[in-house]
A protein has these predicted regions:
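Glycine-centric low-complexity/flexibility signal
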Residues: 1-5, 9-204
């Protein structure tokens, strides 16, 4: 993971520089392309299994690692294998496990594809987008659309010098069944951790 620790006995002069660990935390969800119109007319759900061919995948966070994750440094989706346990109850659906973002729900394979939720850390992650609609449905949103948004990851409620965590990854968005590349619907990684202890600091 992305952890940087600086322990300086004397003065730490930043000389106008900084340490950037954006995207170095828990990995985002690797989106999955369901075959044909398998993911069609499904009710909104907080959790479902990959075997059910429903909804989008959850991200990685303090509660665990799903089967499909996304390495945004290489733009590669990683499959941990069919025997990977993943999350209890399943790796897909809008529910957010721990500080990881939930996946967007898919009401229909060709429309109503909800966006994945953002990862959480100091505060909770944001909801995903309402969802993409094709031409005949463009601009029409219903109560069901609201339920399709992936839920953002929870805030880490009790950070302390001896207890910090990386930012949760973002959930995957609905990948329409038109053959779109799942990489484009995968979630981004959360932020890493920087710990600094110094006698004094300057040049910030």
């Amino acid at each position: 993971g992305g952890v940087v620790v600086l322990d300086v006995a004397g003065e730490l002069n930043w000389n106008g520089q900084s340490v950037n660990v954006a995207g170095r935390g828990f990995r985002g969800a690797g989106a999955v392309q369901w075959p044909g119109n398998a993911d069609a007319n499904n009710p909104p759900d907080y959790v479902a299994t990959l075997a059910s061919n429903q909804h989008s995948t959850k991200a990685e966070g303090i509660a665990g690692t799903p089967r499909w994750v996304f390495n945004q440094e290489t733009s590669v989706r990683l499959d941990n294998g069919g025997t990977w346990a993943g999350y209890a109850g399943g790796d897909t659906g809008r529910g957010a496990p721990g500080n990881a973002g939930g996946g967007g729900d898919n009401r229909n394979g060709t429309r109503d594809n909800g966006g994945g939720g953002g990862g959480g850390n100091a505060t909770f992650g944001g909801f995903g987008a309402y969802g993409w609609k094709n031409g005949g449905w463009a601009g029409t949103f219903t109560v069901a659309d609201f339920d399709l948004r992936g839920i953002g990851g929870a805030a880490f409620a009790s950070p302390a010098p001896a207890r910090v965590v990386m930012g949760g990854g973002g959930g995957a968005g609905g990948n329409n069944n038109s053959g779109a590349d799942p990489v484009n619907s995968s979630g981004g990684a959360g932020g890493g951790v920087v710990i600094v202890r110094a006698g004094s600091m300057s040049g910030v």
